[in-house]
């Protein structure tokens, strides 16, 4: 019934198994990948026909996590999986980025990749198996794909690179880097690091690429065994006559446009060139396919002009050389009621970054397959359409916004203070108000500045820069601080963030089939030069953490005995509610007895702290207290006196006065304030008090007679 194929290979400390022919046989290809107890099922489906008028490559990648994979039932009312989580979106992008450049130009058939996690080992992340499964399934589908690709996670522990580290090993690692590529070159890198030098980062990329050859070879052997039917697809032939016509109409105007330094004026000139082409070559009778072909020729002509100018040593689009960073403008404290804010402008790219401080109650709760955890630092990136002068829909963040926010967050994680040194929850929002290249790196710079503006004691300043590449044959140029057009028309988007001491985040996407180690070395060196330049200007604007905003909560931390927690909370939460209501504070009590008080003023925090100290204080033997009589006991036993909130003691009838007391009510009344001395606290916490011990003993009559 099943024509099943299995391939097993050793990958670091893990055994990887590829299987096909048993599940989802109606898909173009389907592969089940096992790495330890983590199992990911990947299916590829294709459209043999191109949709009418299609002028782009419609690749869709969806990575999905099923809660049953971890033996869980989803929360919520409907008890089923809903919209994709941030982890699912980021992993979908991780799969997409290295495979997209391996499809030939002009291939416009629909391709859908669905990677589904069906079993999960908490120690083995499912992203690497998902990437390997997508690679294998694409090769088995027979589509024109210049793969397979391999993928590897690289850690760096005690000066040694570790292949595919477990979750426990990553906790000790200074690096979490994912690299993907073909047998010949690297295509994609995604990483975060704890301030590592450039040579260590490059070494990790090279190490990962070397190690992934095992996976690439295994997938090739797997494909040879399955022997899939290969698509008979040929790239459409170039219409040289049409190319010549478009060049004749628009060539000179395009060259003139790319001499204009200002983006909007340049765009207007390019629109003029395109309108001339449309007027001359596109009529009502022209079908969509032909119109798209003309548009594609025009876009390639734009790319040719920009690329040839740069490779010939001419100035870039905005007049810079290959190493210069655009002019910077930095302002902090730009919003009066926020906790911290910064406006970071680099050329025509601008980010308004705003930092907000909160308490531990504001931490983000993440219900991951591997278990629930909280996150005390959030960074959210918003890219509204007005940032590029366009009209567009506003709504939930798109995949790109999620990815850019995550990259900026990775860049700042290494410099955040430890929770014990700074117990606030931190949220940064980066609003991109202008965009012409590298808005994610503007978010890194702006995010760092806004945190400093909010008074967060960062370990160091962090800046980010985006590098580009133009590569033709043996000629290449690495570009510092790329513009939007250089990103679209170039061959690489290489983003590096870090401090003066080293790299904290690195992301690389290659649009061609790989680059060499030499190019990566040059890009890292140029990026460091630019990063140091930006850091100098950031430090000149904000040397270190500013004073805490008057509008930010003040956090006061204290520690109480665990057996006192219930006293502070009170019956049904009555005590803690009264403290928060009376002092206007927020109080959080951890299981270990650590109490965090959030207050808007020092006075309110001190008042709440004092109340808690009173509740948790122990009565000291020999100490004098001012107390209130709360009860007269029956049978003339004595009275109960409250000496502290929640702390009562017994004044026995014999301890009320030196003379013999016949009726307690003759001496004490409920509500009466008296001074008492603590005589004893027994093993059960019961307190004996005395009023008599503070009274002078009466003078005897015989002494008086003398």
From Swiss-Prot:
GO function terms (MF aspect): 3'-5'-RNA exonuclease activity; magnesium ion binding; polyribonucleotide nucleotidyltransferase activity; RNA binding
BP term (GO), one: mRNA catabolic process
UniProt superkingdom: Bacteria
Residues annotated as domain S1 motif: 622-692
Localization terms from the record: Cytoplasm
UniProt KW Nucleotidyltransferase keyword: yes
SMART domains: KH, S1
Binding-site list for Mg(2+): 487, 493
Summary of the function given for this chain in its UniProt record: Involved in mRNA degradation. Catalyzes the phosphorolysis of single-stranded polyribonucleotides processively in the 3'- to 5'-direction.
Identification of the protein by name: Polyribonucleotide nucleotidyltransferase
Lineage: Bacteria, Pseudomonadati, Pseudomonadota, Betaproteobacteria, Neisseriales
Encoding gene, per UniProt annotation: pnp
